[in-house]
Every structure is written in structure tokens, then in C-alpha cells.
Amino acid sequence: MGKVDAFLNIPRRTASLEEVEERLRHYRDFHISLSEDDLRDQASRCMDCGVPFCHGYGCPLGNLIPEWNDLVYQGRWREACDRLHYTNNFPEITGRVCPSPCEAACTLGVGDDPVTIRQSELAIVERGWAEGWIKPLPPKEETGKKVAVIGSGPAGLAAAQQLRRKGHQVWLFERDDAMGGILRYGIPDFKLEKWVLDRRLEQLQEEGVNFELNVDAGQDLSAQYLLKRFDAVCLCVGARESRDLEVPG
């Protein structure tokens, strides 16, 4: 796994940032990715841990972090992309906005700077999109079952995609006028530009997920209607109510 002594000789290096004067002219992402050689060097810092806490403890998805870091180090980007998608439907999103508990759990971080895991994740998936490796995966067989997914935030989108790939007919209901939930309406463009989300939504539609916008479940559709029309209902409604701090000032 990785280069045996890389973590001793290669310091942590992250993406650089645009100059402040340039950032002030737009609201887009302002990170400048590392070169391929630098990305491979950073991936090589991943050690052959007996217990990879990044994977088993730090990552809520259980991402196969040591595996795809090693594949990046070897230059096997397509395999890395496949392993990344094995546990994560939307790595281009987590690679931009996740707070990286995996890096906080990295064993190397005990006595040194942790491996740049999120940076590797983003580089892998964007390489996958650029090379055309990420394609729609419609089901090979249909089950004939119908499923309603309520809410199009990250949980709803992932549920809809996984259910569709299993062969179920899926309807994704969203009360707003565009899909995405917090990904669209709660995260600013300098962290997550909306073309990133729209690119993945197009994949879901090509796989056969049905989008239903401006539908407020419980108001426009009753629970009785949903249970009668669908074989299953998956609630992914999120938490839209704000909790303001009642403090002066």
C-alpha cells in the first residue's frame, strides 16, 4: 500500500487558492488542484495501517480509502474511480463539502499531518467525469415495484439512485422548483457550484428516475395516496427549520 517511506519524506500538500483579488470577482470555487504527480505523491503517504481508522471509524460511508489511495499512487485511476463509487454515490459532492472526519481519524495524523484524503477523492471522481468513465447504470431487469422517495437532498438522491439500479420504478418528489435540497439551496457556489449537482442529476434521469417538482408531500399528496399507489415510500425530508441563537446583538 503506497510507498513504504513516503509519509516520512513527503510533506502534506493541499490544493492552492486563487489570489484574493481574483476571488473577489466571482462566487465560484477558488481551489486550484494539484498536478497528477503531486496527487500521486500525496496518495503515496497513505500507510498500510493494520486498522485503517479513516475507513472503519472516520468515514460515515465506509469509503475504501486505503484502496483508492494506493490505486492513485499506482496511476490506476479508473480502478480508483470504480472503488470510490462502490461506497459513495456522489463523491464529487463529498469531495468538496465533507468536513473530512476521515482525515481527523488518519493514523498518520497522530504524529504528523494526515493524508489528504478528500483531495484524492475529488481528483479521482473529476478524472472519472473527464475521461467519460462515469456513465448511467440503468437496471438490467425490472422488478415491477414502484417506490416513492420524498425529498431530493443527498439522502433522497442516493436512495432514488440505488433503488432504481435495483430495478424498481422510482418517483422522486421535491417541494421546491429544482432538485437538490440542501445541496442546491443550502450550500453556496464557492463551495459547491450547481453544475456539479446538475451533472449528477442528469445521470439519475438517464437511469430512469422520475422527477416530480413543486409537490409537497402531506399537502399535495396524502399519505393514503402514496401508500395506495406505491409499493414502498422512503422519507428523506431533511431538516429545513432553522434554529436561531436567541442572543443579543
Please give the residue ranges for each predicted region:
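Residue-level detector of alpha-helix initiation sites
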Residues: 89, 153-155, 178
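Short amphipathic alpha-helical segments
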Residues: 160-162, 184-185, 245-249
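Glycine-rich nucleotide phosphate-binding loop and flanking beta-alpha elements
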Residues: 156, 219, 240-243
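N-terminal Rossmann-like FAD-binding beta1-loop-alpha1 element of flavoenzymes
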Residues: 146-171
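Glycine-rich FAD pyrophosphate-binding loop
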Residues: 168-184
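N-terminal Rossmann-like dinucleotide/flavin-binding domain of flavoprotein oxidoreductases
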Residues: 81-88, 101, 120, 182-231
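General beta-strand structural signal in soluble alpha/beta enzymes
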Residues: 174, 211-213, 235-237
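Ferredoxin-type iron-sulfur electron-transfer modules and their immediate structural context
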Residues: 1-146, 194, 233-249
